[in-house]
Amino acid sequence: MDGFASDTAPIVKDNFKSSWQAEQPLVIIADTKILAAAPTELKSSGFGDMVAKYIGLAEWKMANLLIDEYYCPKIAAITSEAIDRITALADRITENSEEAAGAVMEALVLTGLAMKLAGCSRPASGAEHVVSHYLECYKLNRGIWPEFHGKKVGVMTVILNRAYRNIAERVTEVNPHADNTDWDLVYSKYDACMLNDIKRVNTPTITDKVSPEKLKESWGEIRKIILETLPTDEKLLSLMHA
């Protein structure tokens, strides 16, 4: 879990998941023999949480381009190299392999450190985590087991990766306008007990800082970021099925 090495903690309070400030640990100890013998579903979940970083890295670059959000190539490289290492071992993740289990653990710890260095969660999560958290809250409020975190973000990574690449491949020009999202409709999809928290974390909204003119001007570069950072659908599915 990348959260082990970061200085924030995703905590569920009253069935609502949000990030809280925490202290970064001085030492993290993991026994690869124990990790290798863990249930297959848990190891797959760790792998799913790592491939999700593709989305976070792409969105971080886009945020830097569109709203001048802080971006550090060296920090991004920590996550990118961690992804490369575990995807090279994809076909061994579910085996009783200390090397593969250790690689997943190390990769998650490194991305946690990347979050600390960046001062934000961009190096480790993106829209796939947001949707996963929504699903988790939705299920918790209905007394349903929400599934493992990495399993949810892994599935959402496939869906969002496909959506991003489809847009980048098919849409060559855009004519943006100011955001006119029907936020009342958005809020209606959340349980009443979560509304205050949802409004709090969405004020200001995610699009308030995005200039339509800047989006239009940067569209070519955005497409390039998506197509160069995100894997093809075939590659991603191959990794997930390995």
Give, region by region, the residue ranges found by the protein language model.
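A glycine/threonine-rich phosphate-anchoring loop and its flanking beta-alpha core
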Residues: 1-82
